[in-house]
Amino acid sequence: MKFSKLSLTLALILTQVLFVLCGKINEDFMKHGLESQALHDEIRKPIDSENPDTERLLDCLLDNRVCSSDKDCCGMTPSCTMGLCVPSVGGLVGGILG
């Protein structure tokens, strides 16, 4: 197969552009890791905001299994029952849990 000088030059230029682009992405990754600035700001929001997201809710509940009042249960739907943060569940399970 014969390649013209122009096609080889274009292939070389495109390869260099690809390497530069990958280098910039890698440099940004080395500085910030997997977190973008927007994600970092979201993580820093207070837990007791009006509409807490699911991840923060789960993190709070898993960290605060033992409680002395409802406030220890992140101030959300779960309540402190017998020293444990228990979600408000209806039906048979809710009756058993209190």
Swiss-Prot record:
Primary localization class, coarse: secreted
Similarity annotation: Belongs to the neurotoxin 15 family. 02 (omega-actx) subfamily.
Keyword Disulfide bond: yes
Cellular compartments annotated: Secreted
Pfam families: Toxin_23
Tissue-specific expression: Expressed by the venom gland.
Stated role: Potent inhibitor of insect, but not mammalian, voltage-gated calcium channels (Cav).
Any single GO CC term annotated in Swiss-Prot or TrEMBL for this entry: extracellular region
Segment forming the signal sequence: 1-22
Presence of the UniProt keyword Disulfide bond in the record: yes
Source species, domain of life: Eukaryota
Keywords associated with the record: Amidation, Calcium channel impairing toxin, Disulfide bond, Ion channel impairing toxin, Knottin, Neurotoxin, Secreted, Signal, Toxin, Voltage-gated calcium channel impairing toxin
Domain characteristics, as noted in the entry: The presence of a 'disulfide through disulfide knot' structurally defines this protein as a knottin.
Disulfide-linked positions: 60-74, 67-80, 73-85
PROSITE patterns, per database record: OMEGA_ACTX_2
Residue numbers of Leucine amide PTMs: 97
Protein name per the record: Omega-hexatoxin-Hr2b
GO terms assigned for molecular function: calcium channel regulator activity; sodium channel inhibitor activity; toxin activity
Residue ranges annotated as propeptide in the record: 24-56
